Amino acid sequence: QSITTYSGNYDFYLREREIRREQLLASYRRQQEMLAKEEDFIARFGARVSHAAQVQSRIKKLEKIERIELPPEQRVMRFEFAEPPRSGDDVCRLDGLGKIWLQPDHTTRQVFNGLTGMIRRQEKIALTGRNGAGKSTLLKVLAGQTEPTAGTVTIGANVQVGYFSQHSMDLLDGEMTVAATVQAAMPQANVGVVRNLCAAFLFQGDDVDKKVKILSGGEKSRVVLAMLLARPLNFLILDEPTNHLDIQSREVLLDALQQFTGTLIMVSHDRYFLRSLVNRVFEIDHGQMRIYEGDYDYYLEQVAPVDVPS
């Protein structure tokens, strides 16, 4: 146990405590990523004589590192989500998919064309590409929020789709409380289960009785994500789910999605999030789609500029 002193009034204390928590969580997260990389290297090359010195060096390095510990109040409460219903093995097929948007000046813009691919059960896919490449548009098409201009999307057998975007928050009923909103997503659940889910998404105590209309953007995001994960959905389509979320909320969401046994495709600029989650990458570039059969680190290796010998 340790005592931390704050030189200021109570408002200053609250602000400063939050800043320190964020800094500690950021340091913890960086260290966890570094430890994972080192442990991965040791696991991959531990049996190779040619790498013996490097492996031993890294083992010693890990032994000397002082682990960052989070105080108990910052540890994430885990919620055991119900197993989603099993879908067919082929979750979503894209055949020659194209999309053209009509611009305000009545001209047209082709976003992408001829996209073809298959999303299979239990895949967790990152959808990448530069800004304006059409990532959000593709997710809207997959979720049935807009029709493709060409080609087809075929959703597989027993697939239940859940879609999250920044506009999802606008659909919440501002007069309902957090608890009532989450309860509506899981009507058969008792009050204890609902409160546990709210707590897992950082709504504790009186927070569950707040009306949605007074929540911040990040809090509304957490409500929508809690509702999505409470429902019996087995194909999640997520457009920037970590926007507006602080570090602790992102850890909560990451833990929930790592537990999730359904299928997932998402857009996110959070590389740590993608590294920790996805096992396949779809990249949209100049209206076409490339598919990378590996995790996010594999994708980064493939697209990294090649060093040309001078």
Where are these regions (language model features)?
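ABC ATP-binding cassette signature C-motif
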Residues: 1-26, 75, 81-310
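ABC ATPase nucleotide-binding domains
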Residues: 22-40, 44-46, 51-60, 75-76, ...
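Generic structural signal for alpha-helix termini and adjacent loop/cap motifs
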Residues: 45-48, 68, 144-145
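Generic structural signal for well-ordered, non-transmembrane alpha-helical segments
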Residues: 60-63, 92
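Amphipathic alpha-helical coiled-coil segments
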Residues: 64-73
